Amino acid sequence: MHIGGYFIDNPIALAPMAGITDKPFRRICREFGAGWAVCEMLTSDPSLRHTKKTLRRSDFEGEGGVVAVQIAGSDPQQMAEAARYNVGLGAQVIDINMGCPAKKVCNVQAGSALMQNEPLVAEILEAVVNAVDVPVTLKTRLGWHDEHQNLPTIAKIAEESGIAALAIHGRTRTQMYKGEARYELIAETKGHLNIPVWVNGDITSPQKAAAVLKQTAADGIMIGRGAQGRPWLFRDLKHYAEHGVLPPALSLAECNATILNHIRAMHEFYGEVAGVRIARKHIGWYIDEMPDGEQTRREINRLDSAAAQYDTLAAYLETLPEKTDRWVCHYREG
């Protein structure tokens, strides 16, 4: 799979998710086999460039792979300037957000709200592509709602505007993340394009990934929520794609070490206060389905210091061998 001049020999990607796919999480997913990882969404509003949140999200040092940065907005010139600005900071690929369904994004006509205005889509894509000399990609959905599934039109506009690749989530905006992702329109759209396509949505196992790739003829898969609390999913996806079977499961000790390293990295990246707060959701995703996991999560959520959070989690993980011999993994059951 080629994105401009970049060759991706492993087109299994980590989707950009605001507040989740930060530098520590991208790094761990890459270590487990993600061949592409897009940074968290950055606003195109220049007045917000120097906020603490934006500065953290703009920290690409030591990324460990191609630096793909997602920008969001609805003003063509502002988006073009944001693209130039981020390339100046080290972005090697610019990704345009046309898939976010969040109200605060759609209320300013950005994210998936853009799909309602095809002429504006063309203006934005052309402005960004012409503003930078790096590849520009686009993440989008099936459409705004079921009666307005204009993905084929948006995809053709994208290709004609010079977009290097598409990532398509198999839901409309009004679906948010409810119901099941649908892939029929993605397959139809892919058949009329000459640029690479990632398929995204509800891909939570290697078996599902193989089936969706077969159905859509997509060039790669993009994993979002399926990786939450399971970054080792990328290891299994890659092995299954190459060999047609699952690799041996990670041991409890290997999973525990991964989790603790991740939490420590968040504490170091964000600092004491923000690190503890942001780590809570990841800890929940990791342990909720494990023995006594929910109870432990509630206990950890009451803690305010990084040391207490880490030590309590470590103590819990040390008890797991007494309660189970493996990490919960639904696609390995039976």
Which stretches of residues belong to each language-model region?
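Alpha/beta catalytic cores of nucleotide-metabolism and tRNA/nucleoside-modifying enzymes
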Residues: 8, 12-13, 18, 23-24, ...
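Aromatic- and acidic-residue-enriched carbohydrate-binding clefts of CAZyme catalytic domains
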Residues: 115
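Hydrophobic faces of well-ordered beta-strands that scaffold small-molecule active sites
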Residues: 12-16, 37-39, 67-71, 94, ...
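Active-site beta-loop-alpha junctions enriched in small/polar residues
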Residues: 17-19, 42-44, 72-74, 99-101, ...
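Glycine-rich, positively charged N-terminal anion/phosphate-binding segment
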Residues: 1-2, 17-92
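Alpha/beta enzyme core
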Residues: 31, 80-110, 118-195
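N-terminal small/glycine-rich loop or linker at the start of catalytic domains
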Residues: 1-12, 45-68, 100, 104-108, ...
